[in-house]
Design a protein with these regions (language model features):
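…; additionally, a secondary subgroup of soluble metalloenzymes is captured
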Residues: 1-459, 469-619, 623-848
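Beta1/beta-strand and adjacent pyrophosphate-binding region of the FAD-binding site
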Residues: 463
Length: 848
């Protein structure tokens, strides 16, 4: 600054408005270099008294300012070095005054209220940084307390990386994210306006970066390899060893926070992919057993390798199914599981199919019809369920090419073993029947009489979901059990034959007789049973306080309307059509399993609405029929030539006719069982899973035939519980910390947790995350996920041992730190904050 600039600057300084109760301006100017010692006498600033401070007049100066002249503005000039506060006679005056300096570092220090002269070299290092008002403002906004050299460096880095807190972890993430975006602007700004060496010194201090080359990519590689090394069970090759940091814990915590941050994890994904390719992680994994890296989730390729290996083992026919399921279970709580959740679940359900085949010794037993029905509802249905769940998840896979061979295995087992074996044995058992009715099995056409008619004053809601199979209802029953306070039970009945909508819907209505006229309309007590209006009339014939209505109409009703509509009624039939609507359409039949999941959600929404809006206490969910579905194309050998009928109704799975014909590959039943003796109507259905040839596409989803999948119709009975009793309340299992100690003495520590009870009806799983934080809520450890879903009676199998890695930092043993345990699926769910003391004397990665 030249003399005129100084005069102008001082003039502005003394002209500033007074604040904080001040009556005048006092400014100190230490000119140690004596650059202006000869000019000070020529300074003539209006209303400013200039005092020259030297070694001998400090006491006089103090006396003059405080006693003799208490009104004028004063400039105290000294050609001495600025004294330390403890050696400064005038420090009390200086502390409430302003300081003028011709060097930028001093000006900035004074502005920031930094009075330690030992820090001046650090500020001088950043002269270029402090030339910009925006950068100064960003630095000020960090509100740094108790300045140190390191805090200055971190503050500069935070300002340049646009991080608003003093956190080296956040600074590094910002630099990495910018680098991954291809910009690298933040790092260039550090080189231009900051101190590149200071950054790398901090990376060495906190993360152990020891390479000579200042490389962001090497640093990222070090973080990831160090983390990998902590969770694998084999020794890394020599070429990887330089990338293993000695500051293990900070690297582990950094990566854990990075991948678990919702706003940052997309950058983590890009980072790990970049590094995995560079250091050839795939080649490394090929040399080792899956068990040796089963708990490592640092690189996405690990999940791909594990999935590929399990698929290969399954396709090769190796039957170690429990081991494969345990592999999938282990991966559930790890980072990339959610990305590949559909693949993992598809594989799980494929394993369940294969495992069930193994449990059955690859054999479906020959039994009488009644026993076959019992075997189906107890064990065989599970294969249909597993097939449905496999395809539901397979259709959502992003990695279909890799899983398509497993699909072939599933198709082979389901079609060529299960459906074929089951249909052969079932056809054999029903061939002995004199009538379609199986003794001892509830009948669909007696549904109203047995479930509705004698309910007395209790209003009953019946939800009829078109195409809801028994295997699907088993899952829905579990969902209802765990959705609401109440009791839900599953039963079954033998559906009518042919198993198609027109007849199944009629069978569920109250009736004295069912007829099929010459046009093959189904009449209930002489009323055509097709359509909601006709069904409403049939219901009212039995009980005038009845109503038939569609699902969509109910769901569209406002609260007042639904209460008014249902007021005074005894019986409400609600017709729901999601599964059959999608399955029975050639363009959407592939979506039938997704439609089933949609149906679950819709039915649960309906149940909730009925309970909450009209206080429904008794709800029944049933169906008109089931269906057969296979994903693979129908073979020509599985199609029967179409039959021309003089009269009748036909479909891919049945012929309904007045002609009692013998057709090869079919089985025939008289309709007398339903229509009454002398009906002169017959149902002809292909044996097994064969279809009649019919023009057009859409042969994969069919119903109308006599298979167990088509004709075992579910009955779910849900009783809502409005009592104060807790018997039917739904609760999550509790996962509690069981470790007794509340003192941590090692930077790596293990804690034990316990699932308090097994999973069962009304007791559902809980997924929690747990981590340590300080009093201000800053995370200081990695995050662990615990999934409490064990069904075991054995307490040992409900115990979890989790590894916690603390940041390498100074801990205050007089302060409290907290283990946070919180529900990972519900922000309003379970939360616990358990106080701990951390007493680690000298911090390194071994805790000593």
């Amino acid at each position: 600054m030249n003399l005129q600039e100084i005069r102008n600057f001082l003039k502005d300084l003394f002209s500033k408005p007074l604040g904080d109760g001040k009556k005048r301006h006092i400014v100190f100017w230490y000119d140690e270099a004596e650059d202006f010692i000869e000019d000070i006498d020529t300074f003539d600033i209006e209303n400013v008294k200039v005092i020259k401070l030297n070694e001998n007049n400090a006491f006089w100066t103090k006396y003059y300012i405080e006693k003799e002249d208490t009104t004028n503005n004063i400039l105290v000039y000294s050609n001495m070095k600025k004294p330390k506060p403890q050696e400064d006679w005038l420090y009390d005056i200086f502390s409430y005054s302003q300081e003028f300096s011709t060097d930028r570092a001093t000006v900035i220090m004074r502005e920031l209220k930094v009075f330690d002269p030992l820090l001046k070299p650090e500020f001088e290092t950043y002269n270029v940084f402090f030339k910009n008002k925006d950068r100064i403002s960003a630095f000020k906004n960090l509100n740094i307390q108790n300045y140190t050299k390191e805090k200055i460096h971190i503050g500069i880095l935070a300002s340049l990386t646009k991080v608003k807190i003093m956190d080296i972890e956040e600074i590094i993430k910002a630099i990495i994210k910018d680098y991954i975006d291809g910009s690298n602007k933040l790092y260039e700004n550090i080189k231009k306006f900051g101190n590149e060496d200071a950054l790398w010194e901090l990376l060495e201090k906190y993360y152990g970066y020891s390479f000579e080359e200042k490389s962001i990519e090497r640093f990222m590689s070090m973080l990831l390899v160090t983390n990998m090394n902590e969770t694998i069970k084999f020794e890394l090759p020599k070429s990887y060893v330089p990338f293993i940091s000695k500051k293990t814990t900070n690297c582990v915590v950094f990566i854990n926070h990075f991948m678990n941050s919702i706003k940052d994890n997309e950058y983590y994904d890009k980072m790990q992919e970049l590094v995995a390719t560079k250091i050839k992680i795939n080649n490394l994994l090929e040399k080792h057993d899956t068990d040796s890296f089963i708990e490592c989730d640092v690189f996405e390729v690990i999940d791909k390798v594990i999935l590929t290996r399990v698929i290969t083992l399954l396709n090769d026919g190796l039957e170690d199914y429990e081991k494969y399921l345990n592999i999938l279970l282990t991966r559930r709580k790890l980072y990339y599981y959610n990305k590949y959740v559909s693949e993992y679940k598809a594989i799980k359900w494929a394993i369940n199919i294969l495992n069930k085949k193994k449990a059955l010794d690859s054999s479906i037993k020959s039994e009488k019809a009644y026993d076959m029905v019992k075997s189906y509802i107890e064990k065989y249905y599970y294969i249909d369920k597993s097939y449905r769940k496999f395809y539901y998840h397979y259709d959502k896979c992003q990695w279909k090419d890799e899983i398509k061979d497993l699909k072939k295995t599933v198709e082979n087992v389901y079609n060529n073993w299960y459906l074929q074996e089951l249909s052969i044995k079932w056809n054999s058992s029903i061939s002995d029947l004199q009538s379609w009715r199986i003794d001892g099995v509830k009948q669909q056409d007696r549904f109203y009489r047995e479930n509705i008619k004698f309910k007395g004053k209790e209003r009953v809601y019946v939800i009829i979901s078109d195409g809801l199979r028994y295997e699907s209802a088993e899952e829905l029953n579990t969902l209802l059990t765990n959705e609401r306070k109440g009791r839900s039970t599953l039963d079954y009945m033998q559906g009518v034959l042919p198993s198609y909508t027109k007849l199944g819907m009629a069978a569920l209505l109250p009736h004295n007789n069912i007829e099929i006229n010459d046009r093959y309309d189904v009449l209930v007590d002489s009323i055509n049973s097709t359509g909601t209006e006709n069904r409403d009339a049939i219901l009212k014939n039995e009980n005038e306080k009845s109503l038939a209505i569609t699902y969509d109409k109910v769901m569209d009703m406002k609260d007042a309307e639904i209460r008014k509509t249902f007021a005074g009624l005894d019986v409400v039939y609600i017709y729901h059509n999601t599964i059959d609507a999608r399955g029975d359409n050639e363009s959407t039949e592939r979506e039938v399993f997704a439609a089933t999941e949609d149906a679950f959600r819709e039915i649960i929404l309906l149940v909730n609405k009925l309970v909450n809006r009209v206080s429904a206490a008794s709800i029944i969910v049933t169906s008109d029929h089931g269906y057969l579905y296979k994903r693979s194309p129908m073979e020509e050998s599985n199609k029967l030539s179409s039959v021309k009928l003089e009269d009748g109704e036909d479909g891919r799975r049945f012929l309904l006719t007045s002609n009692n014909e013998e057709i090869e590959g079919t089985i025939t039943f008289s309709m007398d069982y339903l229509l009454g003796e002398g009906s002169s109507k017959y149902v002809i259905t292909p044996k097994g899973t064969s279809r009649f040839k019919v023009q057009g596409a859409g042969a994969n989803y069919v119903h109308g035939g006599a298979t167990l999948q088509e004709t075992i119709v579910p009955i779910i009975k849900f009783k809502n519980d409005r009592s104060a009793s807790s018997v039917n309340e739904i609760r999550k299992v509790k996962i509690s910390l069981t470790s007794i100690t509340r003192k941590i003495t090692n930077i790596i520590t293990y804690l034990e947790f316990f699932q308090d009870e097994k999973i069962q009806d009304k007791v559902i799983s809980q997924r929690i995350k747990c981590y340590f934080e300080d009093e201000e809520g800053n995370r200081i450890s990695n995050e662990n996920i615990i999934i409490g879903d064990s069904r075991s009676e054995n307490p040992v199998e409900r115990t979890f041992r989790e590894k916690f890695v603390l940041k390498s930092m100074q801990y205050d043993k007089t302060k409290k730190y907290f283990l946070v345990i919180q529900d990972d699926e519900d922000v309003n769910g379970y939360y616990e904050r358990i106080p701990f003391n951390i007493d680690i004397a000298i911090i390194d990665d071994f805790g000593f």
